[in-house]
Amino acid sequence: MAIDPSKFHLINVADTCAVWNVLSSPRLHAAAKEAHCEFCITSFVGYECLFKPRKKTPTPSETELMRRLAQEQARGSFTAHSCDIGDLQAIKILESRKRLGKGELSSIAFAMKIGQAVITDDMKARKLAEDSGHPLIQTTPHLFSWLIFKGRLGDSDKPTVMKQHQEMERPLSPHFETAYELALQCKLNAS
């Protein structure tokens, strides 16, 4: 999916991996908030992030990300929304089409219901959202690229964001690099 660094939908329903990727870098998250981006989650995602039993003891990075999410929720961000029967039926239909978790499926269904963007860094989830006719699909690298394009993040922020992201054992650094280059190209084309 090609991204346009000049455009980003401000209201996002985040799936589990997007929650972790946005919160992995305090600098990225702060810039997103300064740019008036809002993130919400479904109750399924909230459960996966904070309460779902894990096979292994959480790593220090996972524990820190859980702490950050709980802190943001206490501040009124990443609000969890319940799904109703219609949403669950949509999830069931979606579930039959792809092998995805309830978090991704509920995020897509809820975003479609409320007409807002779904932010996911899962390729299968993006493909399913696209196949389901949802036009507002975004990723964390797209957010990063847009923040660079808009000047909410500068060149000096790139290594900070990438370092913070890597310290939380998140996998998107190569995609951030590509998104950064796209933002610079888009800025150049706009001038």
Model-inferred region functions:
Residues A2-F110, I114-Q116, M123-S132, I137-Q138, ...:
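Active-site-proximal, substrate-binding regions of enzyme catalytic domains
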